[in-house]
Amino acid sequence: MKPYALLSLLATGTLLAQGAWAEDPEVLFKNKGCVACHAIDTKMVGPAYKDVAAKFAGQAGAEAELAQRIKNGSQGVWGPIPMPPNAVSDDEAQTLAKWVLSQK
């Protein structure tokens, strides 16, 4: 029975470690593929994070709006190329939005 307890403990530790990584916005941006179209201060296919932060600066509800766009995608906001929906949870979208808005 003890080997199962150890295995269970190790599995729980692995899940907790993955959860900690999921909270790191920079790791999320890499793991979710955001970096394929975005950079911090350089426009690529999509806008630079700093440009997004500047556009939303001072707007009420900016974090929730950006989180919704990250999760569901958007079109016609930054030009003709749409941003597709992303496979992120609500919490991940919120984490990403908060981090993007902190870029100045």
From Swiss-Prot:
Any one of the GO CC terms: periplasmic space
Entries under Gene3D superfamilies matching the protein: Cytochrome c-like domain
Signal peptide (residue range): 1-22
Location (main, coarse): periplasm
Highest taxon of source: Bacteria
Keywords for this protein: Electron transport, Heme, Iron, Metal-binding, Periplasm, Signal, Transport
Residues the entry annotates as binding heme c: C34, C37, H38, M83
GO molecular function, one term: electron transfer activity
Effect of D24A: In strain: 129/1224
PTM section of the record: Binds 1 heme c group covalently per subunit.
InterPro entries: Cyt_c-like_dom, Cyt_c-like_dom_sf, Cyt_c_ID
Disulfide bridges in this chain: none
Compartments, as annotated in UniProt: Periplasm
Physiological role: Electron donor for cytochrome cd1 in nitrite and nitrate respiration.
Protein name, as recorded: Cytochrome c-551
